[in-house]
């Protein structure tokens, strides 16, 4: 990624943050891909641009539910034109917020770590589910399964709702749960009408200077969610997906021990991943 004339204040798995002033920052989505909490050496071309477009679409679509990190400004308001041109599709001028110290994970279907948990315990993150459920089955109701926010390279850990309340306070935990479930429910209904099932997703929240809960980071992208094509969805299977699951599945069968460094991902797997991200963007946003 090209250098810009702002000070970098944070480098995450996928996004880099640059300081504009004490109230605003520039959030830039790179083409980096992380899987199993390891950043892979091979970037996914255009991924940052596609993710930013999907995220921006959802931020606007769900703005009636709660405030978000948008400032209403563009990169051209904060960068010289030559720098803004390079980054305009992958950067957002965002409010500086105090992050809420939990990941807000919402699940509508039984898959991934939730399915593994259910097979062992009959529950997902301590939430009891009916007996005899199958992989990829829709849950009787949407569930909120928070996790801790780990540093880059560490694993997030699932926690109970009670533990979530201990970390961020009971009242805030209840607000986070209610908002996360509402965001997911509304988005899942819309996505289904466009041929995408949103199996599960992760929201990030922050507090502004007045203590108002605000949606931030990225929203309902193939990186923060499991998207399934509705026409290929079948209970009792692990449906194909529009996201990095494609890379994850390849890594799972590669024999890798899930510690850095990751093996080199074949070019065709990268190409198919780009196509999947692009397809998700098209389905969701094209009229």
Swiss-Prot record:
GO cellular component annotations of the record: cytoplasm
CDD domains the UniProt entry points to? SAICAR_synt_Sc
Report the EC number(s), separated by commas if there are several: 6.3.2.6
Listed pathway(s): Purine metabolism; IMP biosynthesis via de novo pathway; 5-amino-1-(5-phospho-D-ribosyl)imidazole-4-carboxamide from 5-amino-1-(5-phospho-D-ribosyl)imidazole-4-carboxylate: step 1/2
Q: Name one GO biological process term.
A: 'de novo' IMP biosynthetic process
Q: What GO molecular functions are on record for this protein?
A: ATP binding; phosphoribosylaminoimidazolesuccinocarboxamide synthase activity
Catalytic activity line of the entry: 5-amino-1-(5-phospho-D-ribosyl)imidazole-4-carboxylate + L-aspartate + ATP = (2S)-2-[5-amino-1-(5-phospho-beta-D-ribosyl)imidazole-4-carboxamido]succinate + ADP + phosphate + 2 H(+)
Q: Which Pfam families match?
A: SAICAR_synt
Main EC class the enzyme belongs to:
ligase
UniProt KW keywords: ATP-binding, Ligase, Nucleotide-binding, Purine biosynthesis
List the InterPro entries.
SAICAR_synt/ADE2_N, SAICAR_synth, SAICAR_synthetase_CS
Family, per entry: Belongs to the SAICAR synthetase family.
What is the name of the protein in this document? Phosphoribosylaminoimidazole-succinocarboxamide synthase
